[in-house]
């Protein structure tokens, strides 16, 4: 009965996603996370990295502040960011630069110092329920302009939390941090969960984790999920497993329904890590560079249409050097620009098609305010303009109905950026 009910809820949510109803997240922000690239480069110049983010049109950056890095020794006054035991020097420069560039920041707190957990590694739970709360308070005082926070990362897998219990996560980490962050700044918004898309052999599924948090009376403003694809052939809107307990972008309606069921409609949804590895070089669920670019636009549209989704964060700006790890960036590890770079800055996707009438959606992300754009169609081997220059909405979005049959190739031109979107092939 539960599976049938979930299926009914899923179909209802899918209909809402397709229709783009009034509850769609039209105010959604799109961001990136790439801690290593932001902190160390290349390029060596932090200013150049900020310029790259501006060229991409990034609204927000997610960054992990490692508790064990800032507080390798126990502070005498843990709620005071100026306590001599705290060392914020790794994070101060880049966070201040992001603030000066008017790029919002989401801080994720992770990594227990050994003095909090009996000498274990950073993925072991601290023994004192007040410890993370005190650090969270200090972090908020250090960076008062930052008002969005997540507590831990993928605690449902042992790589990031031992023991991976939703009850202990809620009572020892989330709730103390939530109370402390609200005390430090009432404007702070705090997300819990930050779960991986599926359980590992020793882990907990995101569905079971959400329900365990509800039982433990979790305090949260938003539920955060990392909805990576987990199956070959999975796209942002198809190929996911509806009867399984995993949650990916393809099964996003499951997350929407589960969060509503357990925490109510006032709880928002943050999609805090997402991306597709490109191959070559990746061999793990990798897709071609062109398909990666297409999925960037399709994922942006899916999140835009989803109710209560406020954030979609792309994981990596630059591929990791080790091809067996993450290659989901907009640059290769050698610095070559991939098609996904322009696909992120100018996302473009198909909403629907009825005969030759095709509805397309997109966004011009760099800068703020209404942006000029033009559409092109490939005809007889040549790109032809579709009408004249138009303006996006004040938040950069466009939605057009064009005459385009299946197989037609379309793209967006941004005259201010002097570049094209990825090519959209009508399906």
What role is predicted for each listed range?
Residues 2-24:
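Secretory targeting and sorting signals
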Residues 24-60, 64-66:
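Boundary/entry segment of secreted carbohydrate-active catalytic domains
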Residues 25, 48-57, 92-105, 140-144, ...:
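Acidic (Asp/Glu)-rich catalytic clusters
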Residues 32, 61, 98, 139, ...:
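Conserved, mostly hydrophobic/aromatic
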Residues 43-47, 128-129, 133, 165-290:
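Noncatalytic carbohydrate-binding groove/subsite architecture in carbohydrate-active enzymes
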Residues 56-200, 228-230:
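Substrate-binding cleft and catalytic face of glycoside hydrolase catalytic domains
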Residues 396-403:
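Exposed aromatic-hydrophobic patches
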């Amino acid at each position: 009965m539960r599976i049938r009910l979930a299926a009914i809820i899923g179909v209802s949510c899918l209909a809402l996603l397709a229709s783009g109803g009034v509850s769609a997240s039209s105010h959604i922000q799109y961001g990136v996370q790439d801690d290593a690239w932001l902190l160390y480069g290349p390029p060596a110049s932090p200013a150049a990295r900020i310029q790259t983010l501006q060229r991409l049109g990034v609204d927000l950056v997610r960054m992990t502040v490692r508790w064990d890095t800032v507080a390798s020794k126990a502070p005498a006054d843990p709620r005071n960011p100026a306590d001599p035991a705290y060392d914020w020097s790794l994070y101060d420069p880049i966070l201040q630069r992001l603030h000066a560039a008017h790029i919002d920041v989401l801080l994720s707190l992770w990594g227990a110092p050994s003095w909090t957990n009996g000498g274990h590694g950073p993925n072991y739970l601290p023994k004192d329920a007040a410890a993370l709360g005190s650090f969270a308070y200090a972090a908020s005082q250090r960076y008062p302009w930052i008002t969005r926070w997540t507590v831990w990362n993928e605690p449902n897998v042992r790589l990031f939390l031992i023991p991976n219990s939703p009850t202990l996560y809620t009572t020892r980490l989330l709730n103390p941090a939530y109370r402390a962050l609200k005390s430090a700044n009432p404007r702070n918004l705090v997300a819990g969960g930050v779960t991986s898309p599926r359980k590992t052999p020793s882990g907990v599924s995101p569905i079971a984790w959400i329900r365990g948090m509800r039982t433990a009376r979790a305090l949260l403003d938003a539920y955060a999920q990392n909805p990576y694809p987990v199956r070959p052939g999975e796209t942002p809107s198809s190929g996911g497993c509806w009867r399984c307990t995993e949650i990916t972008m393809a099964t996003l309606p499951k997350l929407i329904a589960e969060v509503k069921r357990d925490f109510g409609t006032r709880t928002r949804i943050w999609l805090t890590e997402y991306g597709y590895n490109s191959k070559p070089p990746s061999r793990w669920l990798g897709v071609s560079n062109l398909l990666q670019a297409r999925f960037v636009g399709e994922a942006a549209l899916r999140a835009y249409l989803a109710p209560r989704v406020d954030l979609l964060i792309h994981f990596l700006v630059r591929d990791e050097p080790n091809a067996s790890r993450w290659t989901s960036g907009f640059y290769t590890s050698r610095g070559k620009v991939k098609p996904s770079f322009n696909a992120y800055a100018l996302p473009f996707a198909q909403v629907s098609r009825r005969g030759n009438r095709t509805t397309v959606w997109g966004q011009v992300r760099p800068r703020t305010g209404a942006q000029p754009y033009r559409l092109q169609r490939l005809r007889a081997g040549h790109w032809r303009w579709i009408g004249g220059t138009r303006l996006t909405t004040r938040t950069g979005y466009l939605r057009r109905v064009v005459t385009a049959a299946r197989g037609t190739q379309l793209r967006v031109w941004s005259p201010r950026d002097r570049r094209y979107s990825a090519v959209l092939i009508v399906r």
